[in-house]
Amino acid sequence: MRAVDLIQKKRDGQELTSSEIQWLVEGYVAGTVPDYQMSAFAMAVYFKGMTTREISDLTMNMVKTGQEFDLSAIEGIKVDKHSTGGVGDKVTLILAPLVASFDVPVAKMSGRGLGHTGGTIDKLESIKGFQVERSQDDFIKQVQNIGVSVIGQSDQLVKADKLLYALRDVTATVDTIPLIASSVMSKKIAAGADAILLDVTVGEGAFMKTVDEARELAQTMVNLGKAVGRKTVAVITDMSQPLGRAIGNRLEILEALEILQGKGREDISHFICELAQIMLSLANVEKTVEEVRQHLENGQALKKFEAMVLAQGGDLEDLYRPVTVDYVVEIPAQEDGVIEALPAMEFGLFAMRLGAGRAVKTDALDYETGIVFEKKVGESVKKGEIVAKVYANGKISPELVTDFQKYVKIKMSDETLKTREIIEIIS
């Protein structure tokens, strides 16, 4: 078998056999298929796509290139959740302990942020002492003991994906559904959970720009999960504006704590309760959204989060401290009206300029910096009223303030704009 023949076959729109896909994946990890040929194959997939069977074969062969976590020692149905990424996405910080507070074990591996999108692991590392690198044994013991753990992805997990993702990143082949689906699901399958909730974001701040694209990706991943016996549900969610009020690692921890105390904004609190209801249902625990919400209001979810922080070496006193920055700049509205748009991509990149995100993987983060919105889409505002606060450790230039104000779209209208977080559920 030769890589060039498989590249040509896919370039011409033909279907690869299971053995051909296995040979290609194994050869790439072993180094016998070089980067330049794998990048050509990825580009062929970008233009010609893959069948459902090909994607399934690719995914399972990728799983076999690394360690597979065995969570069978944990009693009950283990649930996991994945988001395709967004801005201000602190959902896991609240959702994992909330679901665990119903005695459903949550064993989750999360990633780091890159570009305009944030990463759960970076947010947790903003807590003094919090350890995200844990052995498989420690991970399992923690879930057995307190019901929840969120750790960084093991380097030993799905080696093919690590290699292929780095290649796709520099060859303009990131945004192709077969390769996104196989990347996400190979890691979720290898992580060992019995049931998976997929949060497929769509809109200005997401990889998927249209609902049709998001639906295709969601259905592909749900089919992959079901094919290997994992209960899988996907929700298509709106990422046209930042999620919640805060963007930035430490700021998002503080917002998560507000929500875990039942004090968060109604829109994000309700959204997370809806996601928790779906995750609980995957574990055969049927609750109403209001029953789920009670665990935010009565402190049970917060206790789980605090227990996880302590179990992973975090400092509870540091957990609740306010951010410490050199400058806090208030951004006023430039006119009366209704907030029509807060483009998630623009504000994600703005936060990155403050040090809250990475332009490249080697960039150091400033955990304290970021943005807190006082107004969100659909809310009325008067000229001069504060729309947001910018937290920075370097002086903020007038040009930066002007950029921020330019991104805030205000509509001259008395009409109240409706926003929705969950657009569609696919199971």
Where are these regions (language model features)?
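Acidic, glycine/proline-rich low-complexity segments that act as flexible tails and inter-domain linkers
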Residues: 1-88, 307-311, 426-427
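A glycine-rich helix N-cap at a beta->alpha junction
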Residues: 123-149, 219-225, 229
